[in-house]
UniProtKB/Swiss-Prot annotation:
Phylogenetic placement of the source organism: Eukaryota, Metazoa, Ecdysozoa, Nematoda, Chromadorea
Protein name: Transmembrane BAX inhibitor motif-containing protein 4
CDD domains (alphabetical): GAAP_like
Main location: membrane
GO molecular function, a single term: calcium channel activity
Transmembrane regions: 78-98, 110-130, 136-158, 163-182, 189-211, 216-235
Keywords: Membrane, Transmembrane, Transmembrane helix
Family: Belongs to the BI1 family.
GO cellular component: membrane
InterPro entries: Bax_inhibitor_1-related
Biological-process GO terms, alphabetical: endoplasmic reticulum unfolded protein response
Superkingdom of origin: Eukaryota
Pfam families attached to this UniProt entry: Bax1-I (PF01027)
Subcellular localization, as worded in the UniProt entry: Membrane
Organism, scientific name: Caenorhabditis elegans
Length: 276
């Protein structure tokens, strides 16, 4: 076994922005594919068979395409996510500036539950119709609107200074993580399997905190959550490039958008605790 393993090629990744073309690689190994979102027609057969190449990369993914396709995909995804974030900021600002909005929303807290159900329904619809143009854009717009209203309800619970500071910190962190991931050749998807367990830990810690209401524990949970979503953002960006086809831009946008919102919520609570 030692002799055989010594001849196996180590996984190699390239700078996603560099000029290379691995579309002619033939070497494949059978491996379970963890991708949850649908892939292109060209690569779905490989996904169903669990086939990836020697680098652990799905054939037909963005990372295996030429530089022009990679850059075009990134521009499209980041452009859509940027529009989603700007729209969300606008809705949050509009809700925040409603007179006595925080008291109104606390009095009618039930408004959050229809948003939650709507988000779940739209996530399912986006999964099914991810490549059905223009329906996928309509569903994405509706999903963004629902999330924007939800975020608007959240930010009304905090002072404007805290919200602005958290938004700036989140923007700097996200930009740094994007730059690091796109320029790095490491395989970040190896940590994907452990994310589910860590998210469960975060969920149960949040439930625990609801009953005991300890400021110190709440701060630790939020710091842990912020770190977790930073790692998840890096992993998702890596998965998007090496487990998604160029046709899966809608799924990519949803993944990144939700990661950024979750990171913002954690940073918002950390900043609020620090300013007390």
């Amino acid at each position: 076994m030692a002799t055989i393993n010594s001849h196996l090629r180590e996984p190699e990744r390239v700078n996603l922005l560099s000029d290379h073309d691995d579309s002619d690689d033939d070497e494949v190994h059978v491996k379970r594919n963890p991708q949850m979102w649908p892939m292109s027609m060209a690569s779905s057969a490989h996904a169903e068979a669990g086939i990836v190449d020697a680098d652990g990369i799905l054939p037909g993914c963005v990372g295996k395409a030429n530089r022009m396709i990679r850059i075009a995909f990134l521009r499209k995804v980041l452009g859509i996510v940027g529009f989603q974030l700007l729209f969300t900021i606008g809705i949050c600002a509009a809700i925040y500036n409603i007179p006595n909005s925080n008291q109104l929303l606390q009095k009618h807290a039930w408004i959050v539950f229809p948003n939650l159900l709507g988000s779940i329904a739209l996530i399912i619809a986006l999964h099914v119709y991810a490549r059905e143009v223009p329906l996928n854009y309509v569903l994405l717009a509706a999903f963004t609107a629902v999330q924007a209203v939800t975020m608007g309800c959240v930010v009304t619970l905090f002072e404007a200074k805290v919200v602005l500071e958290a938004a700036v910190i989140t923007g700097l962190v996200v930009a740094s993580l994007f730059a690091y991931t796109l320029q790095n050749k490491r395989d970040f998807s190896v940590g994907y399997a452990s994310m589910g367990s860590l998210l469960c830990v975060l969920l149960w810690a949040g439930i625990f905190q609801m009953f005991f209401m300890s400021p110190a524990v709440n701060f630790v949970i939020n710091v842990f959550g912020a770190g977790l979503f930073c790692v998840l953002l890096v992993i998702d960006l890596d998965m998007i490039m090496y487990r998604f086809s160029p046709e899966d831009y809608i799924c990519a946008c949803v993944s990144l958008y939700m990661d950024i919102l979750n990171l913002f919520i954690r940073i918002l609570q950390i900043v609020a605790e620090a300013n007390k």
